[in-house]
Amino acid sequence: MKRLFLSIFLLGSCLALAACADQEANAEQPMPKAEQKKPEKKAVQVQKKEDDTSAWIKTEKPAKLPILMYHSISSGNSLRVPKKEFEAHMKWLHDNGYQTLTPKEASLMLTQDKKPSEKCVLITFDDGYTDNYQDAYPVLKKYGMKATIFMIGKSIGHKHHLTEEQMKEMAQHGISIESHTIDHLELNGLTPQQQQSEMADSKKLFDNMFHQQTTIISYPVGRYNEETLKAAEKTGYQMGVTTEPGAASRDQGMYALHRVRVSPGMSGSAFGAYIESMK
């Protein structure tokens, strides 16, 4: 009888041990794919295309656009505007409801006679000085403004000029880098072939550096001739800007657009009156 009980006890123990082992094995197995929790997909925000003008305001006459012309944000001569004055100008634009444009938006506004806001402006800087990054860029970010820097190709990374890294950082925050030619030569003193080379090489440089279609060129020192205008169109630009005074309009020709020179010594209110006079 004792032997029978002992046999039953041993048999039960073996069965219990087998069941435990089976449970442990199952616990170590991965969850079936159907039961695994899949990572949640993040919602993707689709940004409105830059060339979507469906909600823009139609103008009753050829659109006029003030294209502001700055150079260095410092002091010392008539091309330099101190940071304090520059900030006063940007604050005035912000407080008075002006929308700052990209070159692409400016091109659409001038060619389609439509505008994204009642008050628009294109802010530009010639030459690509380091202080555009150190002093202008923080102010532009503060007020949520776009701007365009016309960079000299050969000056990238040179003393007092922007580096590639600085330009790429700004390009991620609403600052467009566009063409001021390769060598900053007075174009009206060059042959047609030399002009084309200056423009084409600069466009290729910035197209590749920023994975973009470089849209606009600023002629060095404002010097140009009829061959310059032909070369700008032939090399693939959509616009060219000069130093001729006044607001831009397509009546001037898309490759001979005027600009509004901003000189030092202007308070915010004086700057505002100047801009309002361009209407």
Swiss-Prot record:
InterPro entries: Glyco_hydro/deAcase_b/a-brl, NODB_dom, Polysacch_Deacetylase
Signal peptide: 1-19
Keyword Membrane carried by entry: yes
Membrane as UniProt keyword: yes
Cross-referenced SUPFAM superfamilies: Glycoside hydrolase/deacetylase
Domain NodB homology: 119-279
Chief site of localization: membrane
Source organism (scientific name): Bacillus subtilis (strain 168)
Basic and acidic residues: compositionally biased ranges: 34-51
Gene3D superfamilies attached to this UniProt entry: Glycoside hydrolase/deacetylase
Swiss-Prot/TrEMBL GO biological process terms: carbohydrate metabolic process
Gene, per the UniProt record: yxkH
Localization: Cell membrane
Chain intervals for the UniProt region annotation (Disordered): 29-51
Family statement drawn from the similarity comment of this UniProt entry: Belongs to the polysaccharide deacetylase family.
An MF annotation (GO) of this entry: hydrolase activity, acting on carbon-nitrogen (but not peptide) bonds
GO CC annotation terms, alphabetical: plasma membrane
Family annotation (PROSITE patterns): NODB (PS51677), PROKAR_LIPOPROTEIN (PS51257)
Lipidation (N-palmitoyl cysteine): 20
Pfam families in UniProt: Polysacc_deac_1 (PF01522)
Keywords associated with the record: Cell membrane, Hydrolase, Lipoprotein, Membrane, Palmitate, Signal
Lipidation (S-diacylglycerol cysteine): 20
Name by which UniProt lists this protein: Putative polysaccharide deacetylase YxkH
Membrane topology: Lipid-anchor
EC number: 3.-.-.-
